Every structure is written in C-alpha cells, then in structure tokens.
C-alpha cells in the first residue's frame, strides 16, 4: 500500500532554506531496487566486492522491519525517495572551479570563510557527491590523507585498507537503515592520520542535501593511528520542502593506542527531514574519543553515537544538545560498550523542547565481563519551554563485570519565573530573557565548539526562540 507523502508546516530558516534548483543534475528513479543499486555502483566504477556488499545490504534491508522503539517513521515511503542525485559537476580542488549555483550555496553557509580562517582541510558534499575537497599543504606534508572516500577507494594504496574497515563497525545487519546505507551509500570522507601525527587545526566536511524528495547517504571513515591526534568537524543542512527527505549516513571512527579524536557535529536539517544517522567509534588501549553534538532541525531523528572501548584505559566522552520545536520528534542519545579493564565514559546531554516538540534521550551503557574496574557516568538535563512539549529519559544498563562504577542522573524542568523577572528588571525583554537562559543552559556544548560553530548554534537557538512568548 502506498503511503502519503509527509506534509510539514513551513518554518522560517532563511539562512538555510534556499535552493538554486537542479539544472544539469542527474536523478535516478525513486525507490530502491537491485537495478538502482547496480546503476549507482556502475556510475562509480566500483570494485566487485563493493557491489557485492551493496546487493547483500539490499537483501538485508528488505528483510528487516522498521524500528519499533522510537518515533514513528510511517510517513517515510522509500518508494518516493530518490537515492542518488548527481550534481552538475565533478569534484573540484579549486573553489573558483565549482559551478556558481553550488558555490553560492556554500558561500551563503560560510564554508569558504571557515576554510580560510581556521581549517586545515574542507570537503563539501552536495546531494550525492562531493563537489569540493581541499587540504592545506601543512597537513599533507605531515602524511595526513583527507579525501573523498570514493577517490580513496580507487587509489591502490588505500583500497585494501578501506576494504578491511568499511562497514565493520556498522555492519548492514545492525539495523534496517544501516542496511539501506550499505546498499545506496554515496560520497563522504576518508581520513588517515599516521602514527604520532598531531594536527593542530580541524578538518571539516559539510553535507548539503539540496534535492527535493531525495536521500543523502554519505560514508565517513576516519583512522587515527597510535599516538595521533585529530579534530574533525561535520556540518549538515538542507532547504525545507513539503515532502519527506531522508538522511541515513554512517560514520566509522578507528582510534588507535594513546590516540585522540574529537568529532564535532552541528546538524541543522530542514524540518521535513528524517534523520536516521549511525555513528560508531572503536577505541584501543589508552585511546580517547570525544563526541560533541548539536542536533537541530529534522522532522524525526534517530541519533545515538556509540563508542566501543576495546583497549585497557580507553576513554569516551559525549557532550550533546538537542532542540525539538514544533512538528519535531527527536530521539537522541549515546551508547557506550566498556569492553576492557579500567575503561571510562562520561555522557552529558542537554535537551530543549518547545511548541509541542518531543525530545527523548536514550543512554545505553554495556559493561562486558572484560570491563573490570571500569567507570561510566550519565547526566541528562531537559528543559521544557511550554505545557505542550514533552521530554523523556530512557536509560539502559547491562552490567556483566565485577567492580564497576556506573551512575545515571536525569532532571527535567522549566524556565524559572524568578530568573525571567530578574532579567526583565534589568531592562531585558521577556523573549530576550528566555533566550539568554536557554543559551546558558546550552553553554556546556557551545563552549566546546569552534567559535564559528558556537555562534551558529547560539543563532539557531535564538531563531527557535523567536515568537516563543504568548
């Protein structure tokens, strides 16, 4: 039975809600079939093993049921989703060579300025393909590899490593949309940081889904070898449409012994988006993974970055904020598997809901029998801005080890009238006062972001708060 397309109320996000059309773009047919999967693979001239993985993933996708634990995705009909849209250009390494319509999009989003100001490298994806990729000479001279993952897949030096790692942390059997990703993935980044290499400036990838009724399925694969250090930033946005769009990307992070990786994300999808993203890290002995996450936008969201701590004294920290407004049901959280002695994890999240938005936080801490002497703490704070909104906290703990210390605390509250009245007594309007309080609530996340992204997050909160009074 054919489902109706999702209708979503218009929301003013003028910085992101613009499009220059699709002149010269190539769209495959909507839906997902073996022929479509083969066509995607053929366009990319992939090795046979990748085509085999795609077709096997499609079989798994067709067998698996929709998830039952989170928000309804009944309005998402894959028969209406276009899984591949090629923009009107191949990948460029010179910004001036990018077509004007795409270049104007990223310039409005501030990507070139960010690259000039503080980034060691940047990749920009438009719909299904990377359109721009560049890395500073200082990073390349250090032996760091930062390229499109498809470019690396066709490089004899890196194809064996990609074959070894690709979709091993997130196998197609993990869940239905991991299988979908395995079948139709396109675009994304490959990063390799050699042993002992420490990059002082971040790398960034920005993903823009421009096409109406389409999906974006980029794959990010990052390998940080022993004693190396990297900060990677991911940004996402899309214009709004009155039909469903889908994002089902995947992120696989391999962190070596005594290595450190910070992965920062600001997701600002349009509110017709189904964001069903999967992110996972494996951390070896004395390694450290930091997740910094800001989730704004999307109609329905499932997002639970996961850390598997496989080496003694491996560490994971997660700091995240989710803002659910009108018409949004965002189910977010974090998972940690303590799978070696003396591992440790901290999870700190902030959730904000307004105008009937629903925000759910899920945490899962698993201590395997190998995790003796490990520790984990989970803290969740939620702020509801009106009587129509909802916030839930759903913790899960599975402890099979001795001598572990695992704790969880959660608080749900509202903005105190006394705080608002105090600020108003200083000449601040009620709306500005509430915005200031919400920004203060979000500060533990924003202070961990690069300045430009912290400003963007505060502006997003301000935009969401406009008209919140009355």
Predicted regions and their residues:
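Short arginine-rich
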Residues: 62-71, 441-451
């Amino acid at each position: 039975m054919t489902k109706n397309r999702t209708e979503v109320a218009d929301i003013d996000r003028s910085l992101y809600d613009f499009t220059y059309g699709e002149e010269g773009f190539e769209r495959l047919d909507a839906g997902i079939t073996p022929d479509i999967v083969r066509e995607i693979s053929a366009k990319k001239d992939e090795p046979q093993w990748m085509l085999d993985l795609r077709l096997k993933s499609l079989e798994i996708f067709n067998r698996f049921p929709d998830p039952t634990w989170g928000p309804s995705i009944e309005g998402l009909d894959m028969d209406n989703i276009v899984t591949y849209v090629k923009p009107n250009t191949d990948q460029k390494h010179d910004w001036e060579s990018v077509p004007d319509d795409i270049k104007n999009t990223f310039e409005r989003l501030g990507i070139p300025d960010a690259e000039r100001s503080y980034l060691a490298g940047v990749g920009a994806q438009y719909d299904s393909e990377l359109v721009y990729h560049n890395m500073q000479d200082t990073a390349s001279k250090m032996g760091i590899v930062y390229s499109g993952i498809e470019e690396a897949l066709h490089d004899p030096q890196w194809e064996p490593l990609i074959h070894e790692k690709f979709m091993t942390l997130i196998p197609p059997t993990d869940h239905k949309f991991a299988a979908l990703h395995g079948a139709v993935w396109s675009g994304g980044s490959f990063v390799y940081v050699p042993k002992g290499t420490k990059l002082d400036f971040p790398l960034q990838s920005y993903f823009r889904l421009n096409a109406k009724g389409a999906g974006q399925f980029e794959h990010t694969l990052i390998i940080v070898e022993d004693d190396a250090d990297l900060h990677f930033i991911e940004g996402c946005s899309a214009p709004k449409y009155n039909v469903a769009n889908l994002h089902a990307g995947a992120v696989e992070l391999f962190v070596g012994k005594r290595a450190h990786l910070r992965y920062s994300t600001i997701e600002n999808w349009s509110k017709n988006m189904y964001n069903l993203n999967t992110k996972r890290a494996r951390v070896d002995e004395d390694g450290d993974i930091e997740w910094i996450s800001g989730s704004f936008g999307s109609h329905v969201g499932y997002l639970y970055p996961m850390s598997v701590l496989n080496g003694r004294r491996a560490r994971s920290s997660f700091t995240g904020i989710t803002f659910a407004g009108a018409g949004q049901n965002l189910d977010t959280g974090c998972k940690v598997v303590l799978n070696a002695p003396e591992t440790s994890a901290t999870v700190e999240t902030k959730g904000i809901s307004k105008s009937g938005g629903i925000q759910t936080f899920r945490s899962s801490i698993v201590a395997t029998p190998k995790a003796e002497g490990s520790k984990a703490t989970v803290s969740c704070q939620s702020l509801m801005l009106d009587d129509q909104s909802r916030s839930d906290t759903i913790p899960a703990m599975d402890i099979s080890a001795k001598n572990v210390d695992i704790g969880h605390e959660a608080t749900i509250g509202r903005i105190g009238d006394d705080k608002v009245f105090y600020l108003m007594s200083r000449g601040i309007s009620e709306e500005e006062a509430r915005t200031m309080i919400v920004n203060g609530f979000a500060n533990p996340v924003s202070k961990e972001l690069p300045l430009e992204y912290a400003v963007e997050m505060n502006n997003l909160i301000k935009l969401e708060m406009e008209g919140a009074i009355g």
